[in-house]
Amino acid sequence: MDARILQNPIHHLKPPEADCVDAELPVVDLIFKMQEITPQHTRGTGAVLVTQDSRLVGIFTERDLIRRIVSPNKDINKTVISQVMTNQPETLTKEDPIVFALNLMHLGHYRHVPLVDDKNSPVGVITSKNIAQYISQFMITA
């Protein structure tokens, strides 16, 4: 594999559009949303971006569900996303190189990185699975 493929912009990965929810959505509703089967998420989704006025304000992942809801035994009917999300997550753009995403995921122990435009509006999300699938295409053809 030629390491230069990691210099390609993130949009080469064809990242899926972001699943976004409002910061005041009850956790119980978000859990149902994360389980929904869609053409782009055939087994549900592991992360949802949280917005307020169309701007990214947080991310809620499966890890957040375990650490901030299940473990402390919070009432999912009375808790809203803004109380348990990861605030102001680190972001990238579709034009950033793939290697930036790998580095950010490695340093932050993330599996999902939000992609935003110049107004901080979500345009997608990149996952470790997206990167692994992209790299594997080049391994097979090598």
Regions found by a protein language model. Name each.
Residues 1-142:
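Tandem CBS (Cystathionine beta-synthase) repeat/Bateman regulatory domains
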